[in-house]
Amino acid sequence: MNNDNHTSTLSGKAVYIVTGATDNMGSIISRRLAEQGKPVVLACRNLEKAEAFADKLKSKTRNSDVQCLLLDLSSFEMVNDFVERVKALNRPVAALINNAGTLPRHSRISPDGYEHTIQVNFLSTVLLSLAIYPLMIEGGRIILSTSISRHLASLPYEFPAVSHFTQIGAYAQSKLALTLFSIYMSTVMKTGRVSVNCVNPGVIKTGVLALHRWLDRAADYLVNPLPDPEAGVIPTMRALESNDTGFIFEGRDKQIKTSTMLKNRDVFIKLCNDTMRIIKKHLPHDATPQ
């Protein structure tokens, strides 16, 4: 899959983008990449917090190639603003690690007219991934964060519209949709030069996965216990090192085909068509899928 000459020429300059890079798992992923000497782009909503974290990383890892760019996934316009900032770096992208996510207790509508959880966790993440794809090196990585909660979800006919909001329901639907759409990205789009994988960090001690319902947390813990964010980043680091595509990485050694989530082909086709109909309106011209 790799073009060795192309990769050897560019990989020294290619950046690793981590979304949600300052909190919990994102900060650990960023630190590990910086420790490896990778050029890291911290993609965050709070630039002041990101700059302070970047200074800390540079000091602790002695890696000066750490920088911050503003990214807010709550609207398509702000996603595209971020992509333009990445282009302005004049550097290729080695990996896009889609770590950012949200789990609000209450529903609200995004500036684009979608439920906020669905916009951030699914639609804007898809837009970001497709817009960054043309900037990536041969052998690049797109990593999408899924959740065990995807097994609790089904996608209603009106999705991505949400007719009835529940906290875990919207979150689970966003993660199921993202997992299924990764099949489209890794196979239907034939993105052979870039691998597309999902990672499931398990239930860990982070704010975003605190479901505020003891039953959900207890059930998840019994299925896939991981005690802290350090353990939760293991699947991401494994996916970064793997040449495989179309997989879900879990824990220290588990790896399953994403296609195992494909239970209803009609639902899958509708999801892909509806999602691309929305996303194509906001994609840069050079990122429009063939």
Model-based region annotation:
Residues 120-140, 150, 154, 186-187:
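Amphipathic alpha-helical dimer-interface segment in Rossmann-like NAD(P)H-dependent oxidoreductases
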Residues 47, 68-84:
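The beta1-alpha1 cofactor-binding region of Rossmann-like NAD(H)/NADP(H)-dependent oxidoreductases
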Residues 6-44:
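Canonical Rossmann dinucleotide-binding motif of NAD(H)/NADP(H)-dependent dehydrogenases/reductases
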Residues 81-88, 105, 112-119:
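Active-site Tyr-X3-Lys motif and surrounding loop/helix of classical short-chain dehydrogenase/reductase
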Residues 118-129, 143, 174, 225-228:
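Short alpha-helix in the Rossmann-fold core of NAD(P)-dependent oxidoreductases
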Residues 101-109, 115, 141-193, 200-213:
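Catalytic loop of short-chain dehydrogenase/reductase
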Residues 19, 93-101, 121, 143-146, ...:
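Rossmann-fold scaffold of SDR-type NAD(P)-dependent oxidoreductases
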